[in-house]
Amino acid sequence: MEAEPIPDSSMPAKLLAPPCLNLERLGGSPSQEKPRTPGCCRISERSLWPACQESVTALCFLQETVERLGQSPAQDTPVLGPCWDPMALGTQGRLLLDRDSKDTQTRISQKGRRLQPPGTPSAPPQRRPRKQLNPCRGTERVDPGFEGVTLKFQIKPDSSLQIIPTYSLPCSSRSQESPADAVGGPAAHPGGTEAHSAGSEALEPRRCASCRTQRTPLWRDAEDGTPLCNACGIRYKKYGTRCSSCWLVPRKNVQPKRLCGRCGVSLDPIQEG
């Protein structure tokens, strides 16, 4: 039987273990290990510098930039030990940029305020006033010097609006008018009395000629101007039947050739001439 080959002990130790590991620490006992900084890995000097050369260069550049800005490194950038966190350094760089942008905005706003004259107040928002700037009292009703028109608004019983205008006399006729005529009242002006009576007649409430109602959503007039309420006007327009004596428009269930229930006259259809 052939003996198994004995491993060569003269093989270099760096081929048996990676170069980044510390062979002394691996061969020593746990009791001989030195205390290390928490969160940091012990790496041999041979592997530390090639891996972190660029990071150390960037750190030195950032520290020089902070010193040029006149800011203390103790306030802006904490003192970094042998092991530093690149993420924390990037966050601090963002904070510095944010502070610089805020300072620039503050300076621009202060510069804009200085450009305005010191005595110029800020323009308030324009708002339309609800009342007149110089309100004046209206003319009295019995003022003899009033010239113009007076409008009188009244609501009819059928909820319609009626406007009655009253015009003042011209200046020429007013100057020729004697004081006695002005004091005489309505008796001295028969024309005014007639106009007043015509206005009072117009103020009388409308009444349906068929059902005698005074309230309806819509008034409908017949061909001769006779006022009819909405319901009676629709029936009269549809069937064309009414009493020739009292203008009673029968309901739908009342047949023609019947007598009027109000005056007894026959309800014949109206023949258009």
Curated annotation (Swiss-Prot):
Name of the molecule in the record: GATA-type zinc finger protein 1
GO CC term (a single one): nucleoplasm
Taxonomic source organism: Homo sapiens (Human)
GO terms assigned for molecular function: DNA-binding transcription factor activity, RNA polymerase II-specific; sequence-specific DNA binding; zinc ion binding
Keywords assigned: Activator, Developmental protein, Differentiation, DNA-binding, Metal-binding, Nucleus, Oogenesis, Repressor, Spermatogenesis, Transcription, Transcription regulation, Zinc, Zinc-finger
SMART domains: ZnF_GATA
Coiled-coil boundaries: none
Database matches in Pfam families: GATA
Record region (Disordered): 99-143, 172-201
Biological-process GO terms, alphabetical: negative regulation of transcription by RNA polymerase II; oocyte development; positive regulation of transcription by RNA polymerase II; regulation of transcription by RNA polymerase II; spermatogenesis
Source organism, top-level taxon: Eukaryota
Function, as annotated: Transcriptional regulator that plays a key role in germ cell development. Determines the oogenic fate by activating key genes for the oogenic program and meiotic prophase entry. Acts downstream of bone morphogenetic protein (BMP) by regulating expression of genes required for the oogenic programs, which are repressed by Polycomb activities in sexually uncommitted germ cells. Regulates expression of STRA8, a central downstream effector for the meiotic program. Acts independently of retinoic acid (RA).
Zinc finger feature spans (GATA-type): 208-232
Entry's localization field: Nucleus
InterPro entries attached to this UniProt entry: GATA-type_ZnF_Regulator, Znf_GATA, Znf_NHR/GATA
SUPFAM superfamilies: Glucocorticoid receptor-like (DNA-binding domain)
